[in-house]
């Protein structure tokens, strides 16, 4: 069990990394935030603001920031990685020789390893070795609301219960509820797939297809999550909780979601390039859609919504063509007989 005297290192000074570092610092933990952008790091360390990702939101005076990875992790009780998925492997590999003995590694990154489609816990385990406690932090949470102190609930799934509990206890507070679990596969799957499905609901809303269509896409999107989860050995209850349904609903309905905003722009006729440029931050769904479908093909699972999103993002179909393809599918039972058995 950690105490408020234990240092925590947070790697990644984007909006979510800054929000979680701010949360930990407000809870009394000595927290150091590492980032690559010297201007952003200086602003956080000296002016207690992240002007690029969370402008106008004050950060705790106690939060320190640095561009020196070795300095950031030195003496840390545990380390939290919060980078985009495409930078996760590189960050963990840089961390490996610097990690203090006994320090567990958690991450709040959502997605798969680009190219291989591997889960991030597989990447971390390969790089860090078998003896390092690992955990994934996930759930319905917008960075801006967390830094504003608005109520939020997340879940921490780990392969060592004591480490997952340590991470959850450090984050848990008056406006931030942290639960625990042991299904890292399900937790990571939900956090990745919801980004793809948020594009679908954004496209539908951008095309002004109505609330019925949005509700249908969310529900059938959850069905896709559950079917892929069953195929890869995840627990269905994980996908029905904060890591799956909770994150799915938030990302599909909240306009703070970058992936939903991407879908809205595409549904209104913008190009992918213009939409991504306008959003101005990493949009995980562009790469994640490929990796979700790679997993689906590997396990022989049909994911029609996710596949149409992938096709639209690659310019293989227009949003209108993707919609027609979904509506033209044959009638069938809502759930396979074997899904919950």
Curated annotation (Swiss-Prot):
Annotated family: Belongs to the NAD-dependent glycerol-3-phosphate dehydrogenase family.
Reaction(s) this enzyme catalyzes, per UniProt: sn-glycerol 3-phosphate + NAD(+) = dihydroxyacetone phosphate + NADH + H(+); sn-glycerol 3-phosphate + NADP(+) = dihydroxyacetone phosphate + NADPH + H(+)
Protein name: Glycerol-3-phosphate dehydrogenase [NAD(P)+]
GO MF term (any one): glycerol-3-phosphate dehydrogenase [NAD(P)+] activity
Localization of this protein: Cytoplasm
Protein's job: Catalyzes the reduction of the glycolytic intermediate dihydroxyacetone phosphate (DHAP) to sn-glycerol 3-phosphate (G3P), the key precursor for phospholipid synthesis.
Organism expressing this protein natively: Stenotrophomonas maltophilia (strain K279a)
Positions of NADPH binding: 15-16, 36, 110, 143, 258, 282, 284
């Amino acid at each position: 069990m950690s105490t408020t005297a234990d240092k925590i290192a947070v790697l990644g000074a984007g909006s979510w990394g800054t929000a979680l570092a701010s949360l930990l610092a407000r809870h009394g933990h000595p927290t150091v935030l590492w980032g690559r952008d010297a201007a952003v790091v200086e602003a956080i360390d000296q002016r207690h603001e992240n002007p690029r990702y969370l402008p106008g939101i004050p950060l705790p005076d106690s939060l320190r920031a640095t561009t020196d990875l070795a300095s950031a992790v030195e003496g840390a009780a545990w380390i939290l990685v919060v980078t985009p998925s495409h930078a996760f492997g590189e960050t963990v590999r840089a961390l490996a020789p610097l990690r203090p003995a006994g320090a567990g590694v958690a991450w709040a990154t959502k997605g798969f390893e680009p190219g291989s489609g591997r889960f991030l816990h597989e990447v971390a385990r390969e790089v860090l070795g078998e003896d390092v406690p690992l955990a994934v932090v996930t759930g319905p949470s917008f960075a801006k609301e967390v830094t504003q102190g608005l109520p939020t609930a997340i879940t921490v799934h780990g392969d060592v219960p004591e480490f997952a509990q340590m991470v959850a206890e450090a984050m848990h507070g008056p406006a931030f509820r942290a639960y625990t679990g042991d299904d890292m596969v399900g937790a990571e799957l939900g956090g990745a797939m919801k980004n793809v499905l948020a594009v679908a609901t954004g496209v539908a809303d951008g095309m002004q297809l109505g609330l019925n269509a949005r509700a249908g896409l969310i529900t059938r999107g959850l069905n896709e999550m559950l079917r892929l989860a069953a195929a890869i050995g995840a627990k269905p209850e994980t996908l029905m909780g904060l890591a799956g349904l909770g994150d799915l609903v938030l990302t599909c309905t909240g306009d703070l979601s970058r992936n939903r905003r991407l879908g809205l722009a595409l549904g209104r006729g913008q190009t992918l390039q213009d939409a991504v440029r306008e959003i101005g931050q990493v949009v995980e769904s562009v790469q994640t859609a490929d990796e979700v479908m790679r997993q689906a093909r590997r396990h022989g699972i049909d994911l029609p919504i996710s596949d149409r999103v992938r096709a639209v993002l690659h310019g293989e179909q227009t949003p209108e063509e993707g919609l027609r393809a979904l509506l033209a599918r044959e009638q069938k039972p809502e759930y396979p007989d074997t899904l919950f058995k």
